[in-house]
Amino acid sequence: TESEELFYADNTFLTLGGTSAIYKRTTNPHTTIGDGLALAFNAGCEIADMEFIQFHPSAIYTESEEAFLISEAVRGEGAYLIDQNGERFMPAIHELAELAPRDIVAQSIYRQMLKYDQEYVWLSLKHLDPQVVKHRFPNIYEKCQELGIDMCDRIPVAPAAHYMVGGVRTDTHGQTNIKRLFICGELASSGIMGANRLASNSLIECLVFGKRAIEASRKNLKTSPTQVFKPIYHCNDNYAALYVHLKKEISRIMTDYAGIIRNAEKLKQGLNELESLEDNLPREINEYYTLICRNLITVARLIIRSALYRQESRGGHFREDYPCSDASYLFHIVQQKEKDLRTLPVNTKKSLN
């Protein structure tokens, strides 16, 4: 119709995914910039545990920053992570070597990259049977071929932002603190992931909590809307370049200051640079590109503030200035618009009622 239309519902569901694309390298689509998170935050939702960002250890490295995921199954098949000298480094770090938890492997790879001033390490499969590799991993093999990489030899890999463990705080039926607003999928923070995430558990979460949210929403059905609003946003194409520039700057800030290995100095520097970016944004509150620029800054700030508050290392959050876990930090960090950051105890006895 080439016109704006509003549809009114008895219940609203947000299923807009995570925030990983605010980092330089991500296994996610480039659109996963956390706009759903910013939307919920600005509406008054409680946002929980945003410091826990999971980085997948092994995504293909290319100069274009494309980060195609190399499954843990490849390492499970026997592939080795090797440094620039061709030496394995994981056996000296963890008893499970290449099969250690994702956060341990990602941190270890990142340290090797810093040590040798390189953008990647190698995932070596040259000691494995090429026919087995091709048969077991046809999709990965095909992708490597497209990129001019011989998977049966070695693959350049580096960590990439993969999953947002935190998100909009919900109960076990997907209900937020705002009545009739439900959140499902990666955008939700139901608490079941803890500080980390086991591979593929998020798929089960979508199925289970999606079904429960639908069942809960049926209690709210009405026959007619109670309020009517007119669209208020417009789009100024002159600001498109501003968005591209700002997204690049924020991905740099998040990668350099709030990435795999963090510390207080870097996190504070990140907050300062975000504030500077925000101060230079246009003042058109209801313009589309300005809105998504502000959303990007909002999401980045939520992550950094939470990471700065948690003065310990736990799960997907590692502080080199606080490298050990601390039992006194066994709580959820909750942020809400125009309210002070607060903490909530972890409910270790939660059941699905």
Mark where each language-model region is.
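An anion/pyrophosphate-binding glycine-rich loop and adjacent beta-alpha core
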Residues: 39, 45-156, 216-222
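Hydrophobic/aromatic ligand-binding patch that stacks against planar heteroaromatic rings
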Residues: 12, 39, 173
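FAD/FMN-dependent oxidoreductases across multiple families
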Residues: 138-182
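Glycine- and aromatic-enriched mobile tails/lids
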Residues: 82-91, 98, 109-112, 163-165, ...
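Thiamine diphosphate
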Residues: 28-41, 47
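Alpha-helix capping and helix-loop boundary segments enriched in small/acidic/polar residues
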Residues: 4, 23-31, 65-69, 73, ...
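Core beta-strand elements of the Rossmann-like FAD/NAD(P) dinucleotide-binding domain
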Residues: 3-11, 177-178
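Glycine-/small-residue-rich beta->alpha transition segments that form the dinucleotide
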Residues: 11, 15-20, 187
